[in-house]
């Protein structure tokens, strides 16, 4: 097992501050072309840099942008213990040496730290945490390579790409269904990020990234290893789910699937490793499922999860948290029941009686959650759902207030304070009804009207939905 000190020593090169204030470039380079302007240059390709792609990656402007993105994303420290807050000072002292090390090909990435993230189905997803330094280096690579591949990627691919989103993917699905493609081949890849074949990935990468030093650096990241309980294990396949390069590498591998589906003239939508193919009959769907499964497993050397992959009507399936419905010969988008269930679970946690947080803090957390959720699912038709969720959530909030008041005398004082007649307030304060029942009774619906709750800071789901739909 390698220790942290050795990792740092292997990465550090001549001293010489490379950073100034909160920049990774010296002030004299502040006017260098930005990476965003490059991404719109249609002439970008691997040959453009004449074998000096690595120098382009390590340009000061690109390094500055990567540093700022990593800093903004925050996140935990990796195996070396360096935090995002420590990063600026670390790069000031070692940035130039690290840059030279990468150019010479002597830089060695650190192993990643593995963590388990619970999934809704009770299982867990393995994510990895690279060191903050390796996040910056992966980010600078991704910022230059992404524009080179963007012009090659399929129009049917929507995941982890600039100016593309899950919303666009779902709208495209509806378009296919509306035009008669009412059978779905839902392909589920088993542990995709853990099973990517390195050799196939490197070959596809090399066709566009015409610099062997860049290819070598990417391969080093693929095989950098995983640290579990202090022991480093080699990685012979897969790409780290959680690394800054992973989304791009995932799209590079699955672009081969996109090309094959386009060659066959199929209607499909892919978002990262979620792929739905649309056809007009059950027979065609079964045939496509069998042939595409063979292609994925034999050609791409990936594994199809046959238990989760299925052929069915689109309104019976879930895609990116959405589903569909048909009414009056029109296809609509709805939030899938599982997505609603998970949302309510998160709302329940914030409004749990056992939660000791203040009501002000709860209101803030609810606003953040509701805003994010509605912004994502706002393309769905969910007016009735939003109204129903609002009623349920208001009742939960009333329950929280009642629980916080606890004692009879406290309840009495607060009821009177909120305008309830003293005799009624005393009667209400002495009730033996349970919390949930009280929350739906006139005792609290009169004490906390909908308008009262709005003034107290409760974000209305329906109001938020009306702004985005």
Language-model features and meaning:
Residues 58, 63, 111-113, 120, ...:
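Core structural elements
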Residues 223, 299-371:
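A conserved non-catalytic segment of reverse transcriptases
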Residues 86-109:
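Amphipathic alpha-helical blocks
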Residues 405-469:
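Extended C-terminal regions of large enzymes
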Residues 121-130, 134-139:
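Glycine-rich active-site/cofactor-binding loop and its immediate structural neighborhood
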Residues 19, 23, 378-433:
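Conserved nucleotidyltransferase catalytic core and NTase-mimicking acidic/glycine-rich helix/loop elements
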Residues 101-116, 120, 152-318:
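Conserved polymerase palm-domain catalytic core
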Residues 1-92:
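Non-catalytic, polymerase-adjacent accessory regions of viral genome-replication enzymes
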